[in-house]
């Protein structure tokens, strides 16, 4: 008799199911950042301990390296109205009196003013359509529909801003996760204290708990703190639907590892130190950049 079972090394989607009461989902950030909860799991014994996040410094050794993602979240959600729609019969865009809103979520910068976005509703964001944002501050021309229904758009900043990023600062809002329903009072609380390079559509949340003081304490122990870069994109927003996790394909994301960062990580590892990735984004960078020698 053949059992229809996966090898234990292969994970199913159901392996990740768990109950999380809504009342246990924090709607506002704790102050200070490093006073949040920390769960420690001993990978050898399976023992679980509950600590405060700042206690993490007690578990870091002098020869270790802490790898952080210094991406910065942009106010990537903008709402506008379709100004022109593409008329197939005429073969050109014509002015429309449509009043329904069109929402774009910027995911990935392709080049200069061309971005991959999520659009809703899709019927108001077809190739050839032109969307107006901020009563003439910026327009977006829908160029193409690509994998996953993403819209490739070209932005044209018309007034009050010098570039797309400046226009987003005027018009955009932070794309908070759907389980956060409270208004974000301070946008900097959705940034890590070491955020540097704008480009993410969501925060690398594991890093939100670090404070400058905690990072200084970690460095004082002799541990190196090394930045890499991953701009969080579509992969964060698309749900996993495949039953076998190995069949899930992640959307590509922009990453960068400088030569200095690679050298420091490799040196620490060669000397017996541990590589401690802050969150899945830093881990994905290292997994993607590693060669056959690790």
Per-region residue spans from a language model:
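Surface-exposed, charge/polar-rich loops and edge strands
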Residues: 2-294
């Amino acid at each position: 008799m053949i059992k229809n079972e996966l090898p234990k090394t292969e994970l199913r989607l159901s392996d990740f199911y768990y109950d999380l009461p809504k009342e246990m989902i924090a709607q506002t950030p704790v102050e200070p950042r490093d006073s949040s909860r920390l769960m420690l799991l001993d990978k050898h014994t399976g023992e679980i301990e509950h600590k405060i996040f700042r206690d993490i410094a007690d578990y870091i050794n002098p020869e270790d390296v802490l790898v952080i993602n210094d991406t910065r979240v942009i106010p990537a959600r903008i709402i506008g109205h379709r100004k022109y729609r593409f008329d197939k019969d005429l073969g050109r865009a014509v002015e429309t009196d449509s009043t329904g809103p069109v929402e774009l979520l910027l995911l990935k910068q392709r080049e200069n003013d061309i971005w991959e976005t999520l659009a809703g509703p899709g019927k108001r964001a077809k190739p050839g359509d032109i969307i107006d944002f901020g009563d003439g501050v910026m327009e977006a021309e829908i160029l193409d529909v690509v994998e996953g229904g993403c819209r490739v758009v070209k932005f044209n900043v018309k007034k009050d801003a010098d570039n797309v990023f400046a226009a987003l600062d005027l018009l955009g809002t932070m794309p908070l996760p759907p389980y956060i329903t409270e208004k974000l009072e301070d946008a900097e609380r959705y940034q890590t204290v070491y955020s540097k390079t704008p480009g993410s559509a969501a925060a690398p949340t594991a890093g939100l708990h670090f404070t400058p003081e905690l990072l200084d304490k970690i460095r004082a122990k002799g541990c190196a703190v090394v930045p890499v870069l991953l701009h969080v994109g579509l992969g964060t927003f698309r749900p996993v639907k495949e039953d076998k996790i190995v069949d899930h394909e992640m959307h590509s994301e922009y990453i960068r590892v400088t030569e200095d960062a690679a050298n420091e990580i490799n040196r620490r590892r060669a000397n017996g130190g541990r590589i401690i990735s802050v969150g899945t984004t830093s881990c994905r960078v290292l997994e993607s950049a590693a060669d056959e020698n690790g």
